[in-house]
């Protein structure tokens, strides 16, 4: 419905002074803490989560809302995404990190102390099991399959058109 032909670019700017990066506590040695400017996803594990407003909400050329509605909805989308992410990470990041640590520690322990010794034991015993399996296959399974194959090879089918 808007009459403007140029695409509007909406950006949200926040000054560093308007919000706090931490809880307001003064730490004794700030060099011990992670710099918030560094890349926290160096291996690009979550590159698929970089969604913008246009990736989620898109209006075709034939149906446009008013420009002010588009700008306000874009701003509300960005603000709500920012605020909700911060809110959820405050309450979920520490418990989920704790649970993930327990899970990975348990899986590592199982892999190191149970799975790998079992696999190594199987690989040590495997040559003798392979010899026994080959003998069973040659003595029982191969003659059975051969006789079944010979029985079915003598079967012939004829189709008649009635």
From Swiss-Prot:
Pfam families in UniProt: Caveolin (PF01146)
Role of this protein: May act as a scaffolding protein within caveolar membranes. Interacts directly with G-protein alpha subunits and can functionally regulate their activity. Acts as an accessory protein in conjunction with CAV1 in targeting to lipid rafts and driving caveolae formation. The Ser-36 phosphorylated form has a role in modulating mitosis in endothelial cells. Positive regulator of cellular mitogenesis of the MAPK signaling pathway. Required for the insulin-stimulated nuclear translocation and activation of MAPK1 and STAT3, and the subsequent regulation of cell cycle progression.
Transmembrane segments: none
Localisation per UniProt entry: Nucleus; Cytoplasm; Golgi apparatus membrane; Cell membrane
One of the GO biological process terms: skeletal muscle fiber development
Primary location class: nucleus
Keywords assigned by UniProt, alphabetized: Cell membrane, Cytoplasm, Golgi apparatus, Membrane, Nucleus, Phosphoprotein
Quaternary structure note: Monomer or homodimer. Interacts with CAV1; the interaction forms a stable heterooligomeric complex that is required for targeting to lipid rafts and for caveolae formation. Tyrosine phosphorylated forms do not form heterooligomers with the Tyr-19-phosphorylated form existing as a monomer or dimer, and the Tyr-27-form as a monomer only. Interacts (tyrosine phosphorylated form) with the SH2 domain-containing proteins, RASA1, NCK1 and SRC. Interacts (tyrosine phosphorylated form) with INSR, the interaction (Tyr-27-phosphorylated form) is increased on insulin stimulation.
Family classification: Belongs to the caveolin family.
Positions of post-translational Phosphoserine modification: 20, 23, 36
UniProt topological domain (Cytoplasmic) ranges: 1-86, 108-162
InterPro entries, per the entry: Caveolin, Caveolin_CS
Protein name: Caveolin-2
Residues bearing PTM Phosphotyrosine: 19, 27
Lineage, uppermost ranks: Eukaryota, Metazoa, Chordata, Craniata, Vertebrata
